[in-house]
Regions:
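Alpha/beta-hydrolase fold nucleophile elbow
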Residues: 104-117
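Active-site loop->helix "elbow" adjoining a glycine-rich segment at hydrolase catalytic centers
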Residues: 88, 92, 117-120
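The feature captures the conserved acid-bearing segment of alpha/beta-hydrolase catalytic domains
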Residues: 151-207, 213
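N-terminal cap/lid segment of alpha/beta-hydrolase-fold proteins
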Residues: 1-21
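C-terminal catalytic histidine-bearing segment of alpha/beta-hydrolase fold enzymes
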Residues: 209-255
Length: 255
């Protein structure tokens, strides 16, 4: 548990699949981006449900109803407090695995995960540590948590709080447990989609390509989609339509 009681209750939005397709019951845990609003990713979740796959949209730690009154943003999950960032990201992964517990208790036999931005990192960590998650759609990718914070446009204020106290090499080592890179081998045997934007300044292109290279070098099966947009423009039409189609098509095919 964290020191904030509000944050210790997990909130989820459950969208059951539309009827019509026979076979094994399928569900996807949806992890939104950092500082996502309560209604974000609900439209995508509805499309997933209409495609015959139930969707469970999870509120990340310190987001939505889980945010204590002293916060206006979910700063505790990504901040210059290195230890707290580790702890809260770990909590997010544990929350996700408990969501999988809930889905299996409801009789779902095939479970996937979809994560965007920070949610993508957390989704890969959850999938790497949970054999029940068979399919992972990772939307915006990087091998290292620290490098995104260090180089990304959206985390410049976090780096400002770190400057002068720690260098990138040390930060990368400390945040390695919450980085995808050490867990690439654990994704072997799963269906994995890696999506990134060609003009992304928040998850810089070099980092996205580096994670793809890790999968290729280790010969861990995966698919790659490169979108003709940046980070936040992924959420704006027509790029949001292209991104949504890419993600849902992959889930529908492999789950």
């Amino acid at each position: 548990e964290t020191p904030h009681p509000k944050n210790n209750t997990v909130y989820e939005r459950y969208l059951p699949a539309a009827r019509g397709r026979s076979g094994k019951r399928r569900a996807v845990v949806v992890l939104p981006q950092w500082n996502a609003q309560p209604n974000e990713h609900l439209a995508l979740s509805r499309v997933i449900a209409k495609a015959g796959i139930s969707a469970l949209r999870l509120s990340l730690p310190y987001h939505d109803q889980r945010m204590p009154p002293e916060l206006r943003r979910a700063d505790y999950i990504v901040s210059a407090n290195v230890g707290r960032t580790l702890q809260v990201c770990r909590q997010a992964v544990l929350d996700t695995r408990r969501a999988v517990d809930w889905l299996t208790a409801k009789g779902y036999e095939r479970i996937g995960i979809l994560g965007t931005s920070l949610g993508s990192c957390l989704a890969m960590l959850a999938a790497a540590h949970d054999r029940r998650i068979e399919v992972a759609a990772l939307n915006h990718i990087s091998p290292y948590f620290a490098d995104v914070v260090w180089e990304g446009l959206s985390t410049a204020h976090v780096r400002e709080g770190l400057d002068g106290s720690i260098d990138l090499e040390r930060l990368r080592a400390l945040w390695l447990p919450i980085s995808p890179q050490p867990y690439v081998e654990r994704m072997r045997g799963k269906r994995v989609l890696l999506v990134y934007g060609r003009y992304d300044l928040t998850f810089p292109l070099r980092l996205s390509r580096q994670l793809v290279h890790e999968f290729r070098q280790r010969q861990v099966a995966h698919e790659v989609r490169v979108l003709p947009c940046g980070h936040y423009s992924t959420g704006i039409a027509p790029f949001s339509w292209l991104d949504g189609y890419t993600l849902v098509s992959f889930l529908r095919k492999h789950l």
